[in-house]
């Protein structure tokens, strides 16, 4: 027996006390045998300590066997113990006693009861160690090794044995539980492991280039996921939105993202596609959708220049016969011309080269009969090929192992083991190597019983989706714990699908009303957007990205995220703003002084695309005649002027003109506006009459003067003798006639 203890080390970063305490309790099976207050009295952190680590207010204890808890013949047993002080004061030293039962647990049900602290077992001490005082915010680790030739390990039959560590301080003690598995070298059970390839939660249609560069860089989330599954026989459940995000960038995609995509394509693993954005299929079915939402077109997010490649063309030097003058150009000279590769189709963007086309994986706990039956019905005539991935906890029964290939009436199922998958997922998100060993040991124990129950029938487990980022090492440890487990052998996905289904019955499940209502609301908004989008030559420029954004917001990565309601509200507000991006500007008052003119109307278009509109005008008074409909193409991101012909009929006064914009499909765009037109058409008639009277009067006066002048000229030939007299008479006549002419 070897006892190795580590000295206390101070924690200089915020310690995840609450999370780690929960992990130690849930994964290692911590059970308090003494009053909790004596061990973990909550302590309020010092409000004045700004640089101090965040403390849990508790002292926590954990225990985990190494090697996934598997002890084969000739193996030693190494167990780690952890004490973490999350209080403001130093914790006193504790003694640790390790006990192992001589009697194997009878079933997986008894294993669950043991780990949960609901049952007891007789354990004999096989080793002991101790801890000194643990400083505030510090953690201590000790390891105890039981040699292979120790009587406690010798000649054990295959099975799962209770393992317990008792932490004692004075008269108080806490017991932490785990299990040791002695494998059976007999028959092996076919095992299929499913691992999701998903991205963190986003509220945009696709991942940006910057996000992709970060996720696919060394140590990034997507890079870690791929590294963790490389070289293993797992089945990949891939979010096609990740692949589309890379492919739509074309030649402008980050190099790391292109390399990641190439590496994914090179993996020989079987795979199937999740819904776009790993959207919540249960929420859609519970919202009453007849079918699942399909991803929308991504054309609006692509650029032509990202899908051209330079093509080298050899420049052939002319021969001497054709060119008498030698040239200095070399035959190695080349020209580069762009070659258009073409915008990829949506199918090409989303392709994952799936081994099976219709596999639906509801989030854990949501794949009950209500959702599964709705999914099968949504596939209509194709329901025979649709497979719903659900968990054994939703199958009615006594907690025994459930066949991986099953059917509930006409619904075809792939059933993964809840207990094993839960422990594997817990291990995959635990960054601490020592604490990670606890759920891995529990997974091995459950897997032993599952293989024993299943015999030659296939088993299915998952390393489920994670709400937090997990490291490559943690995820790979969980994957290897399943794929390399004793008594199992990797089963191809095609073999699992082709296996005869066993009849089972699913429980209904509990609907998540909040997510169902959110799905219904966003879908209703989408219908309004689809009507508005008829202003475009290609409505999918708007509806496509919006649909993909909805699916991303419905993504399972948002589960448990407190900011998800805000993401839903932001998505709905964005749709409202898009619908409001085209409309009439409030018209100004117009003075109409003539019988005909134009009514200026301005159309606001905030979209980056030209929009097709028809302006309908309707006067509310017969004094004004307005052109009923004027068609216009409004320029993108600008205000466009429309001139509506108007004509006054009779009378003067104020006339309201109702203005409506409609799309070519007849959908009203924006709100109705009213233009005030002041008609002054009679002033024009009065002005013309006065002007005509003045012109006519001037013409008459001119004509009279001309006639009189000619008469006088005719009398000039009667004699020069009378000229003087005539001149005098004319002068007198003129003097007397002038006042009369003026009148």
What does each of the following model-derived ranges do?
Residues 115-153, 625-650:
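Intrinsically disordered, low-complexity Pro/Gly/Ser/Thr-rich segments with frequent PxxP/GP/PP motifs
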Residues 82-90, 602-607:
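Asparagine-centered strand-capping/turn motif at beta-strand->loop junctions
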Residues 537-685:
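Membrane-proximal extracellular "stem/stalk" segments
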Residues 178-273:
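Active-site beta->alpha N-cap acidic-glycine motif
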Residues 32-58, 68-70, 89, 168, ...:
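C-terminal region of N-terminal signal peptides and the immediate post-cleavage residues
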Residues 111, 150-185, 567, 650-713, ...:
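Terminal connector regions
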Residues 82, 220, 224-234, 335-357, ...:
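Catalytic grooves of carbohydrate-active enzymes
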Residues 711-743:
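Cytoplasmic C-terminal tails of single-pass
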